[in-house]
């Protein structure tokens, strides 16, 4: 209920945060100024700015097989084993990569134009067929499946990150974020849209009580 403002040391946009192995990593940047931002903290109070070797804005960060991977604008992918030293990787795309998740021994990143790329090591990336040209934004992995959300009411699912299935959502608005909690997938989007599913395949609309756009959800 009570929040305390901490000094991050930056005025740049911060897009995402992750906590693994006693370390907090938050990422972001400034799109128009070509500025990339990575901050690292062990306690959430004191933050250290990290040099990444990229000037692209970063949108999302995931952790798997003992490494952090962050994705961003113009197909940017950077990896790190400790959150301090980062290496630029070739993603094979120049599209914006809005989301990344790790599951079933594979990293999956999604972005503009229906872009989906996957990698088993975070170094070598392969383009996958999504079946849509809509931009893709949200991604989560639970119950042995990846679930991806995007524009035009898009929800896609995959068990392996390679083969993707389109699901009927009953809406055409952008679905921006997704999470998994208490045996239910919950997706949120524009115009106050909330959708739920027990399996990622069949979706039901719920009343949110707002018509405002919902950008993200976490549990």
Model-derived regions: residue spans:
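Residue-level hotspots at or immediately adjacent to binding/recognition sites across diverse folds
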Residues: 1-219
């Amino acid at each position: 209920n009570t929040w305390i403002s901490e000094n991050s040391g930056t005025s740049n946009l911060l897009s995402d945060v992750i906590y693994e192995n006693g370390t907090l990593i938050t990422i972001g940047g400034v799109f128009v100024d070509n500025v990339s931002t990575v901050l690292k903290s062990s306690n959430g109070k004191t933050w250290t700015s990290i040099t990444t070797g990229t000037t692209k804005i970063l949108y999302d960060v995931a952790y798997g097989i003992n490494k952090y991977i962050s994705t961003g604008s113009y197909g940017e992918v950077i990896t790190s084993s400790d959150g301090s030293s980062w290496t630029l990787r070739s993603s094979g795309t120049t599209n914006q990569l809005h989301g990344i998740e790790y599951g079933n021994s594979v990293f999956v990143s999604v972005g503009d134009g229906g872009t989906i790329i996957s990698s088993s090591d975070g170094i070598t990336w392969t383009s996958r067929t999504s079946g849509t040209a809509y931009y893709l934004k949200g991604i989560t992995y639970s119950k042995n499946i990846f679930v991806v959300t995007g524009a035009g009411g898009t929800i896609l699912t995959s068990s392996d990150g390679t083969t993707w299935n389109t699901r009927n959502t009953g809406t055409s608005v952008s679905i921006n974020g997704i999470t998994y909690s208490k045996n239910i997938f919950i997706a949120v989007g524009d115009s106050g849209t909330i959708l739920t599913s027990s399996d990622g395949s069949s979706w039901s609309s719920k009343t949110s009580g707002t018509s405002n756009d919902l950008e993200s959800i976490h549990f």
